[in-house]
A protein has these predicted regions:
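Surface-exposed aromatic
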Residues: 41-44, 114-115, 149-162
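Disordered inhibitory propeptide/activation segment of secreted metzincin zinc metalloprotease zymogens
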Residues: 1-52, 94, 100-106, 180-185, ...
Length: 205
């Protein structure tokens, strides 16, 4: 079993256990603050050991941008000040993906750290699996929590759908409504959503 997890600050760590739900539920984790005001999120990849190809990172972000459309991802050459920092290692842990969303004092995301292990229990993961894990972790970086059904945001990689669904896109728009929806009409200040879960009903593409 390969697991991808999300780390929350203490104030965001208490979520309802989804295992008892009869519905297809997707959690909303967090909301971007002023870093998203220009509609651009920067990212930097720390892979000094060259454990993955550049194509893995590029395609993972392209998968989100092609479906979301309202956020531009810009790669930077410097880790300092980047919005999303991605690090690869070969530690061989069972948990191959972990995202830590760092929040400011008002509860908004100010930066994200994604750590990916290219090994699971000493076995090298296939490149397609690494890409799937990274795509899942980018979902966390965009404000998604976990789901209790077979889709991309399921915490167990073996149960994940490789396709980003409309429900996941709707949840990101809800999480970052102040910028990705309301800001299209007039400038808005960052605002946290009231809803913390989305009922996906069925896995719609």
């Amino acid at each position: 079993m390969i697991v991808a997890i999300l780390s929350y600050p203490d104030s965001f760590s208490v979520f309802k256990d989804l295992s008892s739900e009869n519905q297809n539920i997707l959690q909303i984790c967090c909301t971007w603050g002023k870093s998203l005001e220009d509609g651009v999120l920067t990212f930097h990849t720390n892979d000094s050991q060259h454990l993955v190809t550049d194509n893995v990172v590029k395609k993972s972000f392209e998968q989100w941008s092609s479906k979301l459309g309202k956020v531009n991802f810009l790669e930077t050459q410097n880790a300092s000040g980047t919005d999303v920092l991605i690090s690869f290692n070969d530690k061989g842990k069972q948990t191959v993906g972990q995202t830590t969303n760092v929040l400011n004092d008002k509860g908004f995301i100010k930066r994200v750290n994604i750590r990916i292990s290219v090994n699971s229990s000493e076995v090298k993961l296939a490149e397609d699996t690494i890409k799937l894990v990274l795509t899942h972790e980018i979902g966390h970086a965009l404000g998604l929590g976990h789901s209790n059904f077979h889709d991309l945001m399921n915490p167990i990689v073996n149960y994940q759908n490789k396709v980003i669904t409309n429900c996941e896109i709707d949840a990101i728009l809800l999480a970052n409504n102040w910028k990705l929806v309301e800001n299209l009409q007039q400038p808005k200040k960052p605002e946290l959503p009231i809803e913390k879960t989305v009922d996906c009903k069925s896995e719609q593409m």
